[in-house]
Regions:
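Acidic-basic catalytic patches of nuclease active cores, encompassing PD-(D/E)XK
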Residues: 13-51, 67-69
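Conserved catalytic cores of phosphodiester-cleaving nucleases, focusing on short active-site segments
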Residues: 38, 63-83, 94, 103
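Non-catalytic C-terminal interaction segments of nucleic acid-processing enzymes
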Residues: 123-314
Length: 314
């Protein structure tokens, strides 16, 4: 062991590089303080915490190791940046040992947390998607579910306002600040339907909040799905797997990869939600294990007509 002193990091012990039992990452003050607090919190729960137990077969040491109801659980308190590739590699190591792991995030992850990182660290707690944080100021675990959202809106329940915001943002994105993706989708939409993006069918609007799953707003993917199924004749039939593959193919490169869950976990919910809405809008129907295209969704000549329709349904 060597004693390190630093101007910006507090004095701490670290393992020498090159030894046969691995070494800890350089630790910030928050990481050291939070790890101590998590250890004490686990003690209060009688989880028999141990600090940095080394597993030689995978060359990893979790920040804390717990024993909960006879089961071993690893805890990683992550304050520094961590790539998806490194996260997957660490989780694979724990998977080999059949040890579940809790990834608890520090305060740096509260700032400008984009979809990519949300999906990367999404875990399941009590059958719900969550991100876990540790608040060192209050010395407590924070279970955060606030990331459910609708495209282009901070609201979750006011469907009329969400729809208005989505229509206005689609106009803005298409005509004023088009990204390459929006520009291509706009041209395809105009070529195939003669309409602008803001005039898309009502079923394209995600008015029910969903957990992040893509690097683009879900409404862009949903419009793409409608354009894709319009290539098929009425009464075309898809098997369940064929239908899922069709929807996954749309904006394929924009699906985000989770680091703590099986790849299909979040995507499956997004696909099922849209499938159910397409059934509710009578675009498709289910017959045994097949989905049948029975109606082409209506594009609007005036986006304001959509607002009136939502008013009547509200």
């Amino acid at each position: 062991m060597i004693l390190r002193r630093g101007k910006h990091k507090i004095t701490h012990y670290a393992h020498k590089k090159g030894n046969d039992y691995g070494f800890s990452e350089g630790e910030t003050l928050e990481h050291l303080k939070g790890k101590k607090q998590i250890y004490q919190w686990a003690q209060k729960h009688h989880w028999n915490p141990q600090l940095e137990v080394y597993f030689p077969t995978i060359a990893q040491r979790p920040d804390i190791l717990l024993e909960i109801n006879g089961h071993t659980v690893a805890v990683e308190f992550q304050c520094s940046p961590l790539s998806l590739e490194k996260l997957l590699a660490r989780n694979e190591g724990y998977r080999q040992l059949k040890i579940p792991v809790w990834w608890i995030l520090g305060s740096p992850y509260l700032r400008n947390l984009r979809n990519k990182k949300i999906v990367q660290f999404t875990q399941i707690f009590r059958k719900q998607f969550v991100l876990l944080f540790w608040d060192v100021k209050r010395a407590q675990l924070v279970i955060n579910q606030k990331y459910w959202r609708c495209s282009y809106s901070r609201l979750k329940y006011d469907k009329k306002t969400i729809l208005m915001e989505q229509i206005e943002m689609l106009k803005k994105k298409q005509y004023h600040f088009p990204s390459k993706e929006i520009r291509e989708l706009s041209l395809t939409t105009l070529r195939l339907t003669g309409h602008a993006l803001s005039e898309c069918p009502l079923v394209c609007h995600d008015l029910i909040a969903s957990w992040p799953a893509m690097s683009i707003p879900i409404i862009i993917w949903r419009i793409g799905v409608i354009l894709e199924i319009e290539k098929f004749p009425l009464f075309y039939s898809w098997g369940d797997k064929e239908w899922k593959n069709l929807l996954m193919k749309v904006n394929k490169s924009d699906w985000l990869f989770p680091g703590c869950l099986p790849p299909e976990t979040i995507r499956k919910i997004i696909i099922n939600q849209y499938t159910n809405e397409l059934i509710a809008f009578k675009v498709i129907c289910r017959e045994d294990n097949h989905l049948i295209l029975i109606h082409r969704p209506q594009w609007f000549n005036d986006a304001q007509l959509k607002l009136q329709l939502v008013k009547r349904r509200s």
